[in-house]
Curated annotation (Swiss-Prot):
Higher taxonomy: Eukaryota, Metazoa, Chordata, Craniata, Vertebrata
UniProt keywords, alphabetically: Metal-binding, Zinc, Zinc-finger
Transmembrane parts of this sequence: none
Pfam assignment, any one: SPRY
One GO term of the biological process aspect: regulation of gene expression
UniProt keyword Aminoacyl-tRNA synthetase, yes or no: no
UniProt-recorded Gene Ontology molecular function terms: ubiquitin protein ligase activity; zinc ion binding
Gene Ontology CC terms, in alphabetical order: cytoplasm
Gene behind this protein: RFPL4AL1
InterPro entries: B30.2/SPRY, B30.2/SPRY_sf, Butyrophylin_SPRY, ConA-like_dom_sf, PRY, RDM_domain_RFPL, SPRY/PRY_RFPL, SPRY_dom
Organism: Homo sapiens
ZnF RING-type: positions: 11-53
Designated name of the protein: Ret finger protein-like 4A-like protein 1
Occurrences of domain B30.2/SPRY (ranges): 78-276
Amino acid sequence: MAEHFKQIIRCPVCLKDLEEAVQLKCGYACCLQCLNSLQKEPDGEGLLCRFCSVVSQKDDIKPKYKLRALVSIIKELEPKLKSVLTMNPRMRKFQVDMTFDVDTANNYLIISEDLRSFRSGDLSQNRKEQAERFDTALCVLGTPRFTSGRHYWEVDVGTSQVWDVGVCKESVNRQGKIELSSEHGFLTVGCREGKVFAASTVPMTPLWVSPQLHRVGIFLDVGMRSIAFYNVSDGCHINTFIEIPVCEPWRPFFAHKRGSQDDQSILSICSVINPSTASAPVSSEGK
């Protein structure tokens, strides 16, 4: 999100903040000083847009006052935005010792012996059929359940191209095709094609996230009725769901699909950093 703001207020020519923004006839904006760097039309004094080659005469070039004001506001708020939209290291004291619940895992998910990693496979694992298992969607739940308190965990998505992580209600549908949306009890962020990120709101919310995102931090505060997602590598905020319902337990949720037949990417729950401090404040129900 912070990087998206920076792109909006940055001159595409000199890459400095657009404090003196001007706009060409086509809508292209740059700073006043960079007008001289634009190519002139062959037989006149008009300027050619760098992107669409539309010619702007002198009278077509206007100051972009609203953008100038936006730049000023963002620069003023930037220190506050950094403190609000970044991960608080103290969240880690609520880190949960979490594992995958094999009884809920789709049979085409290959889960490690320590129950902390999985990948998609071609062959069914021949686990017994039961109502709590996802029979079609490539999903698995985590344990423990959460009914109160604050809880934090990290998920390493590695090089996976298609994934979703977050929480879901205990009662979500697990049979047949499922729709990952807040209306159906799923509060998740996910990735498609390794570069398209979105949150499971209705309608879906596009997310501006670094393509190098490999580890997602998730902070669930049942008392405050919110769940927040962070990019652990740089601490940047990804998305927050607020006013979440608390009428039933929440379960950690994970989904993964191979991008191709050769894709051997793995999705993992990260180890607890300091179990002695991470487990004490957590209030949760065991399975």
